[in-house]
Amino acid sequence: ERGITLSGGQRQRAALARALLADAPILILDDALSSVDNQTATQILRNLSEGTRRKTVLFISHQLSAAASADRLFVMDQGKIVQSGTHAELIAQTGLYQTLWDKQKLEEILQ
């Protein structure tokens, strides 16, 4: 950092930029949006979508709205895959994804 103090969100954005510049065919993002606000997260996701069209992206997140646009979602509970499908398919099912989605949407409304 050499005398420059970066916030958590700034560090995350810098790490994400480095990962994208590496131009690897597979990109693994583990909770890459945890330190950024919702507006910044939306912008990052839009840019990621455009910048990773021909790549495999494994996007790990507890923020379901960030993962909703993925081609395929895998829902894990206690280390096991309990559901998989698109966002629309998982919302239509009664299960963990639908429960978590409803809870997160309610939390967003209350904030």
Question: Where are each of the predicted segments found?
Answer:
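Conserved ABC ATPase nucleotide-binding domain "signature" region
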Residues: E1-I4, Q10-R13, Q39
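ABC ATPase nucleotide-binding domain "signature" region
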Residues: S7-G8, A14-A19, F59
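A short, proline-enriched helix->beta-strand linker immediately N-terminal to the Walker B motif
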Residues: L21-P25, R54
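Catalytic Walker B motif of ABC-type/P-loop ATPase nucleotide-binding domains
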Residues: L27-D31
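ABC ATPase nucleotide-binding domain "signature" loop
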Residues: A32-V36
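Conserved H-loop
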Residues: R54-S61
